[in-house]
């Protein structure tokens, strides 16, 4: 008998997610059983962990398992576990709301394209709600470990906007979920169909999965029913690598991550010696939708001596590898370990170092063995990996080998060129790795700063991701070669510079009075005015000194709401350009000033992508054109 019954409305995001999920995931509907068994396995893990300090929570029943039964006549499928269970408050929190930050943003990202929706929803992790793909009504009975028998909870919903919750009596600890299958989904109340799905998706979990199966005598006559274990019930990572198939590794990844897509690659290692641990690390094939959300949960599942301790243990991976999924099972950490203890622990630090190295080696091997697959990884996670040089000085060189860039040698914005590629084809006499940062690939590709480099056939890396400037403030050299921006006023090309030195000196003398005239006109608005011999088609550019903040770094500070120091540019004029020659000969001071202002504004526009006073610029152009 139920008491204290109430009907409540789903959180609006749940309603929306249920409808999208039922339609988008219908083609892969059998995954509902994998999701529910995974949840049951997690409930058992959590009970084991709590029982380490409170063994009475087992209530005399420490034989943890998942049981599945079905009633073909009624069209029901029931999944039950004797794990941690839930209180009334937990039921409302977990089954009535989605307690994930960024849920609204996630739902906004969903479009009308079904395949894309399916992939996004898979990344989000639908868990319990997947039951509604095949059921038109779901009933949950649950009692939390340690709670009295009369403090169990009944939850029911047809998935259409509301649910009911009531107090009931339940003798057994744990959770029982009954799916009232839709008419067209009655196949899931069939023993052999259930066996097939469990064999496919849940053979690898460490918890026994039992089904209520019919027994037969030697003549094939039915003699009764009994609970039969139908999975291996041995944690996959404890088995030897040689006996685990790729398919099993892939399904275990999906169990761990609740991702629907196969992983891109994985590494499974057992380490003995000073430290004893087993790690199973995966690289997903797709970035999660909330990878750049500050509250995005990441980290590895932590086990100690095969006992589950916690999800999302962030302490074992640096932030720039937050896309890595998997688990670590340590023999050296205490069973009563907490997040606080992990934070300041020598064992944790050693494990983090080893797992970071293992992850980078796995990616380096992929880059060498399968360039196409690596570029697929780079498209998904390259931006995150670019955080590495600022976070991990010890592995900076290894991270640098994994970076990929667009190049002036390619006609595509695709980031495919490594620093090793660049160094291998450097010109004789070239001492530096040259790059340019800009707001976009198009802006970088068409920057006037590239003109001399294109003329001399010197490769320049084209960087246009917002993080690039920040990354390069930490990554200043590679393989003994300095990384040098081509936008600096004091750029030294060394042996690669133009050979016409005498002719240039003559030009400097010829234009010296012109340069002084421009300096007088612009005054403190620029740091310096000089002639440049690195332009071919452009009349003027602006540049910064080595000790100054670059344009892109200033933009980065501004976007982050940080105070930005004033950037004073050096104004460089091309003495070979007909416009500069024309302006140098002007006697009328107003006309001279107008042209110099225009050339400066053009140079600023090319460098910054915007002007402080675009209206004045337009008026000046119109005035000079009329």
Curated annotation (Swiss-Prot):
Gene3D superfamilies, A to Z: 3.30.230.80, 3.40.50.11260, Heat shock protein 90, C-terminal domain, Histidine kinase-like ATPase, C-terminal domain
Transmembrane segments: none
GO molecular function annotations of the record: ATP binding; ATP hydrolysis activity; ATP-dependent protein folding chaperone; unfolded protein binding
Region (A): 1-339
Similarity remark: Belongs to the heat shock protein 90 family.
Entry function: Molecular chaperone. Has ATPase activity.
Protein name per UniProt: Chaperone protein HtpG
């Amino acid at each position: 008998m139920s008491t204290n019954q109430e009907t409540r409305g789903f959180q609006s995001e749940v309603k929306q997610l249920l409808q999208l999920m039922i339609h988008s995931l219908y083609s892969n509907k059998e995954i509902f059983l994998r999701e529910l068994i995974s949840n049951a396995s997690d409930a058992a893990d959590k009970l084991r962990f709590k029982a380490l300090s409170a063994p009475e929570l087992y209530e005399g029943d420490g034989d943890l398992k998942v049981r599945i039964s079905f009633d073909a006549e009624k069209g029901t499928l029931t999944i039950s576990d004797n794990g941690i269970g839930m209180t009334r408050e937990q039921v409302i929190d977990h089954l009535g709301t989605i307690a994930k930050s960024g849920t609204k943003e996630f739902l906004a990202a969903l479009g009308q394209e079904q395949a894309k929706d399916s992939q996004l929803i898979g990344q989000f992790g639908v868990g319990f709600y997947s039951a509604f793909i095949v059921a038109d009504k779901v009933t949950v009975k649950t009692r939390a470990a340690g709670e009295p028998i009369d403090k169990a909870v009944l939850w029911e919903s047809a998935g259409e906007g509301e649910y009911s919750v009531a107090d009931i009596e339940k003798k057994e600890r744990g959770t029982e979920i009954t799916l009232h299958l839709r008419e067209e989904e009655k196949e899931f109340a069939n023993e052999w169909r259930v066996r097939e799905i469990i064999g496919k998706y849940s053979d690898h979990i460490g918890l026994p999965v039992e089904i209520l199966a019919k027994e037969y005598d030697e003549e094939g006559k039915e003699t009764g029913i009994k609970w039969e274990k139908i999975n291996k019930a041995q944690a996959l990572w404890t088995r030897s690598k040689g006996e685990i198939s790729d398919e099993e590794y892939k399904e275990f990844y999906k169990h761990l991550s609740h991702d629907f897509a196969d992983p891109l690659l994985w590494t499974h290692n057992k380490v003995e010696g000073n430290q004893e641990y087993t790690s199973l690390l995966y690289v997903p094939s797709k970035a999660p939708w909330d990878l750049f959300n500050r509250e995005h949960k990441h980290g590895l599942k932590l086990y100690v001596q095969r006992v589950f301790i916690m999800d999302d243990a962030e302490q074992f991976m640096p932030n720039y590898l937050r896309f890595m999924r998997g688990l670590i099972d340590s023999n050296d950490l205490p069973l009563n370990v907490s997040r606080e203890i992990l934070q300041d622990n020598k064992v944790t630090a050693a494990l983090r170092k080893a797992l970071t190295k293992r992850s980078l080696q796995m990616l380096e091997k992929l880059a060498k063995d399968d360039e196409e697959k690596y570029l697929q990884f780079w498209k998904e996670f390259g931006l995150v990996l670019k955080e590495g040089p600022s976070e991990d000085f010890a592995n900076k060189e290894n991270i640098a080998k994994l970076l990929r860039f667009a190049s002036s040698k390619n006609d595509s914005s695709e980031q495919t060129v490594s620093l090793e590629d660049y160094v291998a084809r450097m010109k004789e006499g070239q001492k530096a790795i040259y790059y340019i940062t800009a707001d976009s690939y198009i802006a970088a590709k068409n920057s006037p700063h590239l003109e001399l480099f294109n003329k001399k056939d010197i490769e320049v890396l084209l960087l246009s991701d917002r993080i690039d400037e920040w990354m390069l403030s930490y990554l200043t050299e590679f393989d003994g070669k300095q990384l040098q921006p081509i936008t600096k006023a004091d750029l030294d090309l060394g042996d690669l510079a133009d050979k016409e030195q005498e002719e240039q000196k003559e030009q400097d003398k010829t234009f010296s009075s012109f340069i002084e005239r421009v300096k007088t006109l612009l005054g403190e608005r620029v740091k310096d005015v000089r002639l440049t011999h690195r332009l071919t088609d452009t009349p003027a550019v602006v540049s910064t000194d080595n000790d100054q903040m670059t344009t892109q770094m200033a933009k980065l500070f501004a976007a982050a709401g940080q105070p930005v120091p004033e950037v004073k540019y050096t104004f460089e004029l091309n003495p070979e350009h007909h416009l500069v020659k024309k302006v140098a000969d002007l006697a009328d001071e107003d006309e001279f000033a107008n042209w110099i202002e225009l050339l400066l504004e053009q140079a600023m526009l090319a460098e910054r992508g915007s002007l402080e006073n675009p209206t004045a610029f337009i008026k000046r152009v119109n005035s000079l054109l009329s």
